Amino acid sequence: MEHPSKMEFFQKLGYDREDVLRVLGKLGEGALVNDVLQELIRTGSRPGALEHPAAPRLVPRGSCGVPDSAQRGPGTALEEDFRTLASSLRPIVIDGSNVAMSHGNKETFSCRGIKLAVDWFRDRGHTYIKVFVPSWRKDPPRADTPIREQHVLAELERQAVLVYTPSRKVHGKRLVCYDDRYIVKVAYEQDGVIVSNDNYRDLQSENPEWKWFIEQRLLMFSFVNDRFMPPDDPLGRHGPSLSNFLSRKPKPPEPSWQHCPYGKKCTYGIKCKFYHPERPHHAQLAVADELRAKTGARPGAGAEEQRPPRAPGGSAGARAAPREPFAHSLPPARGSPDLAALRGSFSRLAFSDDLGPLGPPLPVPACSLTPRLGGPDWVSAGGRVPGPLSLPSPESQFSPGDLPPPPGLQLQPRGEHRPRDLHGDLLSPRRPPDDPWARPPRSDRFPGRSVWAEPAWGDGATGGLSVYATEDDEGDARARARIALYSVFPRDQVDRVMAAFPELSDLARLILLVQRCQSAGAPLGKP
């Protein structure tokens, strides 16, 4: 231990700087810690904490009081502290041959290396230190076994630190005992630490308990310019520190306060091993759990429970008026079709020609692309819409307000269960939202005046609609329809149908045509 560290050590124990300097000047700068403490105790110096004795304790007459700490010797408390420190450190067992050869660069048995190792552990406060060396190292050095500073061995032997393992000569040959077995056995019995760069592989195979002990209690070292340096992490970077490795009661590691690299975007929640300063006082929930807690929605709640209630009806002329039981539901105006809603509509469509309870299907008329006035192609006199609803013939002389309900349509009172219009979700948004007799988009019609465009619709909700569809609208409608069909049907079939009907942009009609194209040998015709 160097001079500044020694001074700091003794001042922590409570001694004055002058007393420590006086003792160090008497014993020398290289004096051991134990020798300095003994000299401080012998000369009568005591720590500053003990200079003011405690108040005398009252003892009943005729009884013998237990001697107080102030009534004990001047160095009793210091000895107890030193004894406690020494008892908390593990015993040290040094492989003398390995340490000496390591210091001598594996060429010379350097006894100075053993002294450096012993002094390093003494300065840390270890009291049980044993060094094992073969006894033949006491012999005079020879050319094949060079030894340097052999007097160090005798000095350590006098201090009861060095132990010679037995050896003898038989018929002129030296018989040497296995000193490694001594080292491992003593260290195992004392529950100490082995100081060596040897792995003792042969001894690990002899005893499984020794195998575990050697793996967990072997302390390696290095010499750097006559400086003994054990590693700070004897068992690797994830193992204990050197202080905990040499201590019987290792200190728990300090909690890691490393901040999470993801910060507020971390989704690990309570499973995150890093520190989150933004949530120190409440439970570290996952992001999904925090969102559920804020919105008040329980996990797994269906879409029907979170759907907002329908707004109550207003005046007859308002756009938010409640629809009639046979009114169609329309998508938002000028919006691209939603893929999820489109697939839901496909699941509700009956692609076959069977209309169920609405009546048997009628034969499809021959294909004709002749321009004409009137409604869509799938509306004819006495014909039905290819879906669950039927519309009246556009050639009727009645206005939409005077028309009776079309055949096959059963009106039900408001509020009762009714089948949902399957084609309503797929019609163009250019139709009035509240008119049950609205016409399909104008993009699939040839230019012409229709009776459906008369101003007899009542509230004038469609007064701003143009009779003729522009080319831009027609191109946008066909492009949206093509994209929607690509997501469901093969591209070649969609392209074939779109090429056969260049003027058709109604998504519902295109779906039926693609379905017919998919059937084997079915000719393309108007649905």
UniProtKB/Swiss-Prot annotation:
PROSITE patterns per record: ZF_C3H1
Gene: ZC3H12D
Positions of the UniProt region annotated as Necessary for interaction with ZC3H12A: 259-356
Role according to the record: May regulate cell growth likely by suppressing RB1 phosphorylation. May function as RNase and regulate the levels of target RNA species (Potential). In association with ZC3H12A enhances the degradation of interleukin IL-6 mRNA level in activated macrophages. Serve as a tumor suppressor in certain leukemia cells. Overexpression inhibits the G1 to S phase progression through suppression of RB1 phosphorylation.
Spans annotated as Disordered: 48-75, 234-258, 296-339, 378-457
Disorder association: A chromosomal aberration involving ZC3H12D may be the cause of the transformation of follicular lymphoma (FL) to diffuse large B-cell lymphoma (DLBCL). Translocation t(2;6)(p12;q25) with IGK. Resulting protein may not be expressed.
Subunit and interaction comment: Interacts with ZC3H12A.
Basic and acidic residues composition-biased segments: 414-424, 431-447
An example Gene Ontology biological process: 3'-UTR-mediated mRNA destabilization
Protein name: Probable ribonuclease ZC3H12D
Expressed in which tissues: Expressed in normal human lymphocytes but defective in some leukemia/lymphoma cell lines.
Zinc fingers (C3H1-type) by residue: 248-279
Enzyme Commission no: 3.1.-.-
Pfam families for the chain: RNase_Zc3h12a, UBA_6
Keyword Hydrolase among record annotations: yes
Inducers of expression: By prolonged exposure to bacterial lipopolysaccharides (LPS) in acute monocytic leukemia cell line THP-1 cells.
GO molecular function list: mRNA binding; RNA endonuclease activity; zinc ion binding
Family of the protein in this entry: Belongs to the ZC3H12 family.
